């Protein structure tokens, strides 16, 4: 009904907050997952108001995930916008940048270089990571990484590139998913897989933990032995 549709619209973060002609529109790339969906960021002043998809047939077509569309709420309501220092009572308290950097410097001066390490976050920009790397080069520590889960990622491009084009999923006659959950990790990619499955009953095999996908899939196993069996043709 029209009233139900109106109620849904009112619950959108952008609803009734700005007029389209008030917004500055910036073309960008989504960083909420590894798909690289093409997006447009609409902002009023310094505040992001909404995120919309941009057409790119080879990547996201005209789709974006719910996470991409609504993650801006985190910028408004849940983002840390000031430093915090843990006091003697064990609780975090707001602090000035001078105090925060002073506390960091004091801790680092007391420690040996080989005892200092840093891990960058998923959303860190290149400039911040370069500054961190420069700092650690100065203090003589090589212990800096971006793998928060301890994953072993090889330096060869084949280790991190998608082995087929995203658009190629539409033409695939079989699909093997290894150690990934597209529904959670790449919703737009998952939508392409489901569309092909609905149209052709695409055979999908999974090597990894069991998961709740939006299409039928055969659980082949969850270890290296399964992959070896697939490669040598002995897999059932």
Outline where the language-model segments fall:
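Amphipathic helical hotspot of TIR/SEFIR-family domains
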Residues: 183-198
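N-terminal cationic and glycine-rich segments that engage phosphates or anionic surfaces
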Residues: 20-22, 29
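Flexible loop/turn segments at secondary-structure boundaries
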Residues: 17-18, 37-38, 48-49, 58-59, ...
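Cofactor-/ligand-binding subdomain signature composed of acidic, glycine-rich
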Residues: 42-114, 163, 170-174, 194-236
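Single conserved hydrophobic/aromatic residue that forms the stacking wall/gate
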Residues: 1-5, 9
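A short, aliphatic-rich alpha-helical micro-motif
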Residues: 2, 169-170
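Anionic-ligand anchoring segments at beta-strand to alpha-helix junctions in alpha/beta enzyme folds, i.e.
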Residues: 114-169, 209
